[in-house]
Structures are given as structure tokens and as C-alpha cells.
From Swiss-Prot:
Pfam families (UniProt xref): EAL, GAF, GGDEF, PAS
GGDEF domain location: 342-464
GO biological process: regulation of DNA-templated transcription
PROSITE patterns from the UniProt entry: EAL, GGDEF, PAC, PAS
Record-linked SMART domains: EAL (SM00052), GAF (SM00065), GGDEF (SM00267), PAC (SM00086), PAS (SM00091)
Native species: Azorhizobium caulinodans (strain ATCC 43989 / DSM 5975 / JCM 20966 / LMG 6465 / NBRC 14845 / NCIMB 13405 / ORS 571)
Segments forming domain EAL: 472-732
Protein name: Uncharacterized protein AZC_3085
InterPro entries: Biofilm_reg_signaling (IPR052155), EAL_dom (IPR001633), EAL_sf (IPR035919), GAF (IPR003018), GAF-like_dom_sf (IPR029016), GGDEF_dom (IPR000160), Nucleotide_cyclase (IPR029787), PAC (IPR001610)
Residues annotated as domain PAC: 263-313
């Protein structure tokens, strides 16, 4: 089909050439020939427009030849009906098209994409998809050859575009030979130059300027009289471009070879005040009176370049530190001739907590000073970037440089960093990769190592880490599936909570368990963070709340029937759940549905979950208490313990972390810490639960200290709900 179209195009071009040779003027475009052009290319209209002076008001266009399918209006464009193009105003798109046509550019498009006058004009005359080819006579815009098709989705093929360009060239040749171009008066030519939005500069084959329009005067700062006859190299070409310009110009004069002729290129140009600016340039060659003339159309693109550079800064630079961001760092690396030899990733573990707890006034100096420290320690030829909110990466090109930098860094970061009169101790992880490779993969592997390493240490990447991360991903996908389908693989177990004084069973803590068919039992310490990282901790938490409240309600129905006091249930909330906007309403509805009084439900949060977004956490805890639920701070003493926060937190219960209780019998310091915690909590009006009670000795000490409740293996491990419901009223120590 493509060959047939090309053959048809060649035949019609032959007809055009034959008619032009016979007629010698524009009468060659007979209705019959125009109809055959239209049929060959499936057109609905073929027209020729001539531009001319519109009574001193600018350039107008008149349709001098028109063939159209039946039913289409005739575009009778008189001097008064077409808006003239003036330097002071006019339709912006029309002015832009005029500038493009002066440069000899083809214009294609669809009426639906136009605006202003052109949209109204084209719509009125039924134009759908169009192509206009300028008719250039002696390098000047005489008019334009126009075609359009009714197909709104038509894409002009290379064969079609070349054919119409050839037809326009044939018409230009006829006009040049017949002298018809004289219809465009000197006044019209002057008007075209003066209304151009581009600087138009014409030079002869000696490089001397022979024309300089108003736009050129405005852009370059020269007057027309001051530059006519002077070489371009003395007026508008920067010194560092002169040699290149001369060589290219001489080569073109000698051989016709030129890399910029009739192409849109970006160059630098020189103003009268000596400043250099970026410009967009198109050059055409034409002959007049035996002379070779070169018309340059120049546009100042300073604003565009400034915007482009600003966008590049946004795209490739971290605004806080001025370092490359992740994309920018990889861009720098791929621009190097050789592959990097290694990478170091530094992760600031505490940055998120510092930001939410103390604000950007504390966090930003930490980030900036860390960036400065890395910049000062940067190995030769290395690249540095901030590749994440709390992550910096150094990519090295010298063998061994990554490991050496990491060793030096870890030693330096054990000391405080000072900035703005503040001292920071950073909890960090360092991941190191030492092998030649693509920067993308080096960064990925170093990040794996940084995530896996212990605080304050560095870890070299090893291949088994990839398998571990793959397993973690598989676990995350499996967990997501289990939560979505609510299969029996997920279950709740319940650990007893007793009165420390009497040993009487008062309730349970609900603990989620997952048994994977592929991986076996999976620790909550592994899968709960996976749920939080994967974005489905809220769904998991909703299931836990529903299941735990249902279980406790069932126990209490039976206990009430036997005249026994109700048990309470303690439910852990994650950092994700505590900021969920529908949490309070879900809790209220679930308790109401199962008939469990709010006084029987306690919600536990760790210190780190609270400090993630403290203000929202405090509001959530207050609203839970307003429902009638109790609230507890879990694992107290292991996180970011802050007395100021503890004073503000709407908490009823303080749970002492098991690490203090386990050491309490043999370690006087741990014992003293526990005593202080109990006294402090009681002083704040809070009751105390001690976790990790495994011996009668520990229980006895807690009783003496006045601890309210105890939880641990001494009273029982976490157990299924049906087993928990059968426990006796008092749990005698079993250990």
C-alpha cells in the first residue's frame, strides 16, 4: 500500500510539473488538476493564499486559488476580513504562524487543537485536519499552499508532506520566473520584517549584515543603521563562536555542506552591551540579483533556558542540601566514561522521630551537617547524593574507596555532630558494596546492607541478603493475601494478665499469630513491620480489634451467667492505626455490636508509635478514653522515653518492658529502675503492669513495690481463645 501511495504521489507531481511547464504561471493549477491532487491524497480542499500589505495596517492574506468538495464554503479572505499582523497586537497564534512561515516551516495540525481567531475561521469553513506549506520566492514568504482532509485522526505521511513541499516549490519557481513576486511590495516586505516576533537578520556571502528588523534591534540592542554593512562577527556573534562560525560558513560557500541550514538550533548570541544570551536560530539561503543571501531568524530563549535549568534543579537536586537527589546521582554516574567500583549508603535511623517530635528546626540542621560532613570526607572522583528522606549515598570509582570511607565514617559518627550550637548523636546504619557495576544495582545492594546492619555499625553487602529480601517480599505478599482473604492462617492468642497482689486473673492481652503454609510460624516481630511497610497494617489491626472484642464479649457472657466479674482485653495499636481517621467509629461500632462495655477494652501503644505523629496520637487516645476505654503505654523504657510527653499523654496504664523485669532479681540497677517507674506512674495517676514476670522472686519484688498487675510465663503463655476461656479465677505461679 505504501508503494502504491508513493507511485500515485509521483504521478500527480509529474502532472503538476507538466502543467507548470505548459502554462508558465499559476493558471497551471486548473480545477481538473486540483481535483486530481485532492483525489490522490483524499483531500477535501486545496487552496493557495497570497500575503500582502493591508492598507498600512500589517500583513493580510487573500485566497487566490481554491478547489473544494461540494458543500464547503469559499474562504473569501479580503484585506478587511483577515486580521492584519501588526507589531502592536493581533492574534498571537496567527502571528506565531506568520513567523514560522517566514522561516519556511511547514505547519500541520487539527482545528480542534487551535485557539482564538484561527479556531473560529477554520471551524467556519469546515477545516478538520490541515497542512500548509509556505511558498518561498527568493527566500521570502510569498504565500502558502494549503490542503485539508475531513479525517480528524489523519496523520500526514512522509510521501504526502514531500509531495506538497514539491508543489509549493514548483509554484515558487513559477512566481520567480514570471515576476509575480513583485505583487508583494517593498512596503509589504518591510511590514513582514517589522511585524515578525523573531529577530530577522540578513547577511551576504561576505558575512556583512544587509537587513536588521525591529525585533533584532530590541533583542540585540543595536540600531539598524549601526549594523548595516558590518560583519556579523563584530556585532552579534560571541568571541568563542567566531572561529566555528567562520569555518562552517566557508565550508558551506565552498561545498554546500551545512549542519544548521533550515534547521532549528540553539546557539549563543552577543548583545550590544557585551552580554551573551541563549538563542534559537533558523537560517535559510536565497539568491537576489546574483547575490547569495542568508536570512537568520533569531529568538531570545533566556526565559526558556532559565525555566529549563530550574526544572532540572527540581528534578535532579535535593533542595535542602544542594546535593544530587537519587535521579540526579544516577544521572551523574551514567555520564561517566567508566563504571563505578563501589557505593556506601548512610541511613539516619532517628530522623523521622526527630522531625515529628522536635520539628524541622532540629531535623534540618542534622541533615545539612551530615551532608557537609560527607562532602568533606568525599574520596577523589566520588559522587555524593541525598537519595532518600533519611539516606545519603556515595558512589566511588577507586577500588577500596567505599570500604575505607565507611570505616572512617562509622568512627566519626560515634562522636557528636555540632550545628547551630546544637549537638547531635546520630543512630545510623552503613551499607557497603565493593565491586564494579552499574550504579543502580550498587545503590540497591548498599541500601539492603544499610537496612540490615545494626545501629552504629557497617555491613558489607553479601549475596545471601538478596535472598533474604526476596523472602521478605514473599512473606509480605503472602501476608497481604492472608489478610485480604481472612484465612485461618491468622489467629489471635491471649496471654493472661493477673493481679500482682492476689494472682487473680483480670484479663488478657491479644497477640496476633500467623502460621504460613510455606514458611511455618512467622514471628509478629517480623510480619507486623511488614504489614506497616506494605500499607495494610490498618486492615490487619481492624481484624484484630474485631476478633479480640468478639472473644472477650463471649467470655464475659458466660462469666456473667455465673456471677463472675468481667475480664478485660488489651489490644495493641500500630503507628498506622493510631492515625486512621475511622478508628474511633470502628471501635465504637464493634463494641456496640458485640455488647462489650468500653471499660473492658484497653488499647496499648508503644512510645515509638506515639512519637511518629504525637499530636494525632494524643488526640486519638483522648477520644478512646472519651468512649470509656482505657489506654496504656507499652514497653515503657525501651523507646524514646520523654517525661514531658508522658505528662501530656492521656494514659491510664504504664506497662514496664520485660527487659527490666527479667533482670530485676539479680540486678539492683534494674530493680531500682522498676521501682522508680512504678512510683512515677502512680504519681501520675496511672496503674502499672509488669511484663516478663517469669519467677516467683520477681513477682514477690513487684508486690513489695506496689505493682498493680503482672503478665508473663509465670502465669501462662499466649493461648488460643477457647483455652483462655477455661482458665481458673486465680493463676498459681507455674514456674
Amino acid at each position: 500500500m505504501a508503494d502504491e501511495a508513493e507511485q500515485a504521489g509521483l504521478r500527480i507531481l509529474g502532472d503538476v510539473l507538466s502543467a507548470a511547464h505548459s502554462a508558465g504561471d499559476l493558471s497551471c493549477l486548473s480545477p481538473d488538476l486540483l481535483a486530481r491532487i485532492a483525489d490522490t491524497f483524499h483531500l477535501q480542499r486545496v487552496s493557495l493564499f497570497q500575503v500582502h500589505e493591508a492598507e498600512g495596517r500589517g500583513i493580510a492574506a487573500t485566497c487566490v486559488i481554491d478547489w473544494r468538495r461540494p458543500g464547503l464554503a469559499f474562504p473569501a479572505m479580503t484585506e478587511g476580513s483577515h486580521p492584519p499582523l501588526t507589531a502592536a497586537g493581533g492574534d498571537p497564534l496567527l502571528a506565531q504562524w506568520a513567523a514560522r512561515r517566514r522561516r519556511g516551516e511547514t505547519i500541520i495540525g487539527r482545528t480542534r487543537d487551535l485557539t482564538g481567531y484561527l479556531y473560529g475561521f477554520f471551524s467556519h469553513y469546515g477545516v478538520v485536519t490541515f497542512l500548509t506549506e509556505p511558498v518561498m520566492v527568493h527566500g521570502r514568504w510569498w504565500g502558502h499552499f494549503c490542503v485539508d482532509t475531513p479525517d480528524a485522526e489523519h496523520e500526514w505521511t512522509a510521501v504526502e508532506r514531500q509531495a506538497f513541499k514539491c508543489i509549493a516549490a514548483v509554484l515558487a519557481g513559477l512566481l520567480a520566473r514570471s515576476g509575480t513576486e513583485g505583487l508583494v511590495s517593498e512596503a509589504a516586505r518591510r511590514a513582514m520584517l517589522d511585524t515578525s516576533i523573531d529577530a530577522v537578520i540578513v547577511a551576504d556571502e561576505a558575512g556583512a549584515i544587509v537587513e536588521f528588523n525591529h525585533a533584532a534591534e530590541a533583542i540585540f540592542g543595536h540600531t539598524r543603521e549601526g549594523v548595516i554593512g558590518r560583519p556579523m562577527t563584530e556585532t552579534i556573534i560571541p568571541a568563542h563562536y567566531i572561529d566555528r562560525h567562520r569555518q562552517g560558513f566557508m565550508r558551506h560557500l565552498a561545498t554546500g555542506e551545512n549542519h544548521i541550514m533550515r534547521r532549528l538550533v540553539e546557539v549563543e548570541a552577543l548583545r550590544a552591551d557585551g552580554s551573551v544570551f541563549p538563542a534559537e536560530l533558523t537560517v535559510n539561503e536565497h539568491r537576489a540579483g546574483g547575490r547569495r543571501l542568508f536570512s537568520a531568524f533569531v529568538r531570545d530563549i533566556s526565559d526558556r533556558i532559565t525555566s529549563r535549568r530550574a526544572l532540572e534543579r527540581l528534578a535532579f537536586t535535593d533542595m535542602h542540601t544542594g546535593l544530587s537527589n537519587r535521579t540526579g546521582l544516577l544521572r551523574l554516574c551514567t555520564g561517566r566514561p567508566t563504571r563505578p567500583s563501589g557505593a556506601v549508603v548512610l541511613m539516619l535511623r532517628d530522623l523521622g522521630v526527630v522531625k515529628t517530635s522536635f520539628g524541622d528546626d532540629w531535623a534540618e540542621p542534622m541533615i545539612v551537617e551530615t551532608a557537609n560532613l560527607l562532602s568533606r570526607m568525599l574520596p577523589q572522583e566520588a559522587c555524593l547524593g541525598r537519595t532518600g528522606e533519611s539516606e545519603f549515598t556515595v558512589v566511588t570509582w577507586q577500588p577500596g574507596a567505599a570500604a575505607e570511607l565507611a570505616e572512617t565514617l562509622i568512627g566519626r559518627l560515634r562522636s557528636a555532630i555540632e550545628s547551630g550550637g546544637r549537638r547531635f548523636y546520630l543512630r545510623v546504619g552503613l551499607g557497603v558494596v565493593e565491586r564494579p557495576g552499574d550504579a543502580t544495582y550498587l545503590l540497591r545492594d548498599a541500601e539492603m546492607a544499610a537496612r540490615d546492619c545494626r545501629d552504629g555499625h557497617l555491613l558489607h553487602f553479601a549475596e545471601h541478603m538478596r535472598a533474604q529480601h526476596q523472602q521478605r517480599l514473599e512473606l509480605e505478599m503472602a501476608l497481604r493475601d492472608v489478610i485480604q482473604r481472612r484465612t485461618s492462617a491468622l489467629s489471635l492468642h491471649y496471654q493472661p494478665v493477673v493481679s500482682a497482689r492476689t494472682g487473680g486473673l483480670v484479663g488478657f492481652e491479644a497477640l496476633v499469630r500467623w502460621y504460613s503454609e510455606t514458611h511455618g510460624p512467622v514471628s509478629p516481630a517480623l510480619f507486623v513491620p511488614l504489614a506497616e511497610a506494605g500499607g495494610f497494617a490498618e486492615r490487619l489491626g481492624a481484624w484484630v480489634i474485631e476478633t479480640a472484642i468478639s472473644a472477650c464479649a463471649g467470655w464475659n457472657v458466660r462469666r456473667r451467667a455465673h456471677g463472675l466479674a468481667p475480664w478485660h482485653i488489651a489490644i495493641n495499636l500500630s503507628a498506622t492505626e493510631v492515625v486512621a481517621p475511622d478508628l474511633i467509629e470502628r471501635v465504637r461500632q464493634t463494641m456496640a455490636f458485640h455488647g462489650l462495655p468500653p471499660q473492658c477494652v484497653c488499647f496499648e501503644l508503644t512510645e515509638s508509635a506515639i512519637l511518629n505523629q504525637p499530636e494525632i496520637a494524643i488526640e486519638t487516645l483522648s477520644r478512646l478514653r472519651a468512649l470509656g476505654c482505657t489506654t496504656a503505654i507499652d514497653d515503657f523504657g525501651t523507646g524514646y522515653s520523654s517525661l514531658s510527653y508522658l505528662q501530656r499523654l492521656p494514659m491510664d496504664v504504664l506497662k514496664i518492658d520485660r527487659s527490666f523485669v527479667l533482670d530485676m532479681v539479680d540486678n539492683s540497677r534494674s530493680r531500682e529502675i522498676v521501682r522508680v517507674m512504678i512510683e512515677m506512674a502512680h504519681g501520675l495517676g496511672m496503674s502499672v503492669v509488669a511484663e516478663g514476670v517469669e519467677t516467683t522472686g520477681a513477682l514477690q519484688i513487684l508486690r513489695q513495690m506496689g505493682c498493680d498487675r503482672a503478665q508473663g510465663f509465670l502465669f501462662g503463655r499466649a493461648m488460643p481463645g477457647d483455652v483462655a476461656g477455661t482458665l481458673p479465677e486465680t493463676l498459681a505461679p507455674t514456674g
